[in-house]
UniProtKB/Swiss-Prot annotation:
Source organism (scientific name): Cutibacterium acnes (strain DSM 16379 / KPA171202) (Propionibacterium acnes)
GO terms, molecular function: ribosomal large subunit binding
Keywords: Cytoplasm, Protein biosynthesis
Any one GO biological process: translational termination
Identification of the protein by name: Ribosome-recycling factor
Length: 184
């Protein structure tokens, strides 16, 4: 396998991983600490990722307990969650922040599915952009007589197969997220 294909697969794999992370951040009916991954907390004047400041527990299906390592920032964590667009109402008992997720309405589910489809399309576009960049490299090599025309055609076909494989992975992630969102 050529270096161009290996490099393209690596980049496409990271595009799929990014899509997976984006899907994890979309709220479903169940509690999932990953929904707090992108949340930044103002900690001593510096925006800090929440997962660096606290541990997470899921004691019940729709409850997340967030226990800050530094108890002095409990109010900051609560404020960051309240100000976010996660749609949860945090309560704080001085030591931990408890987030009870409300049941998703049909309208909210459809909104999240639409968001998931948008994230999937962004992932597909990223994969196709990698293919385009790799194809450009292959064509340049053929133009510079580093590879033959037959080799160029073979590499382009191989890139198309690799692209299809990674786009299908994103489609599977989307399908799984949609079924998770439609679960009641």
């Amino acid at each position: 396998m050529s270096d161009i294909i290996k490099d393209a697969e690596k980049k496409m794999g990271s595009a799929v991983d990014h899509a997976r992370e984006e899907f994890a951040a979309i709220r479903t009916g169940r509690a999932n600490p990953a929904m707090f991954n992108k949340l930044m907390v103002e900690y001593y004047g510096t925006p800090t990722p929440l997962q660096q400041l606290a541990s997470f527990q899921v004691p019940e299906a729709r409850t997340v307990l967030i226990a800050p390592f530094d108890k002095s920032c409990v109010n900051d964590v609560e404020k960051a969650i309240r100000d976010s667009d996660l749609g949860v109402n945090p309560s704080n008992d001085g030591n931990v922040v408890r987030c009870v997720l409300p049941a998703l309405t049909e309208e909210r589910r459809k909104e999240y599915i639409k968001m998931a489809k948008t994230k999937a399309e962004e992932g597909r576009i990223a994969v196709r952009n990698v293919r385009r960049a790799s194809n450009d490299v292959v064509k340049k090599q053929e133009k510079d007589k580093e590879i033959s025309e037959d080799e160029m055609t073979r590499l382009e076909k191989e890139l198309d197969q690799v692209t299809r494989k990674y786009v299908e992975q994103i489609d599977e992630l989307l399908k799984s997220k949609e079924s998770e969102l439609l679960e009641i």
